[in-house]
């Protein structure tokens, strides 16, 4: 139950690697309770997500991270960007919480889909000629970057847009100048759009 919660980062990461090796050699069943999505992804082949004592989803860890199915499960797996939607086509939605931006999906949007999600690392930055070329090619899912806020972490920039979308961009510990970090547009590939059910 929360085996690493009171440890500093260095010790926690080392012990997680050790536990991963122990579990790989263990032939029985083990149960781990955690709120840390990295622990789940690294240590568990299968997961069960609970909300107020009810099972939201259970199954293969990687499959659930790739397709969490419900809004609550998406949040628990770390998805920062979730918006209610209006279905406007078989493969097209309007994101009501993100200034009514329209998105094309790679899967059919069923009547039971209430929201979409986009993970903060799943955006492609675009600027200058790239933007022009994408627009001329009729590319979809282009998001203008308006009034961004930038926050620096040791190995990432957190960029939040005025419409509430989060983008996380990798950086090195030696980089502190935010100039050039923010592009004109972001693009979300249709395959990166999570189709979600249930309440936000």
Regions found by a protein language model. Name each.
Residues 66-91, 117:
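C-terminal boundary and immediately downstream tail of ABC-type ATPase nucleotide-binding domains
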Residues 10, 76, 129-130:
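Residue-level signal for well-ordered alpha-helical positions
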Residues 1-72:
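ABC ATPase nucleotide-binding domains
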Residues 28-31, 82, 156:
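Secondary-structure boundary/capping residues
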């Amino acid at each position: 139950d929360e085996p690493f919660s009171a440890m500093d980062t260095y010790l926690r990461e080392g012990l997680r690697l050790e536990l991963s090796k122990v579990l790989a050699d263990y032939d029985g069943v083990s149960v781990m309770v955690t709120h840390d999505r990295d622990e789940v992804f690294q240590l568990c082949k299968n997961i069960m997500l609970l909300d107020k004592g009810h099972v939201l989803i259970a199954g293969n860890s990687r499959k659930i991270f790739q397709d969490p199915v419900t809004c609550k499960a998406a949040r628990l797996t770390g998805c920062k960007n979730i918006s209610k939607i209006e279905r406007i086509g078989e493969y097209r939605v309007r994101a009501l919480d993100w200034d009514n931006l329209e998105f094309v999906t790679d899967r059919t949007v069923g009547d039971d889909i209430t929201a979409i999600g986009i993970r903060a690392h799943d955006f492609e930055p675009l600027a200058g000629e790239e933007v022009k070329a994408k627009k001329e090619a009729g590319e979809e899912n282009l998001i203008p970057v308006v009034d961004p806020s930038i926050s620096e972490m040791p190995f990432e920039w957190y960029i939040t847009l005025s419409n509430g979308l989060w983008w996380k961009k990798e950086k090195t510990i030696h980089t502190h100048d935010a100039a050039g970090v923010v592009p004109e547009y972001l693009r979300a590939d249709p395959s990166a759009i999570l189709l979600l059910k249930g309440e936000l």
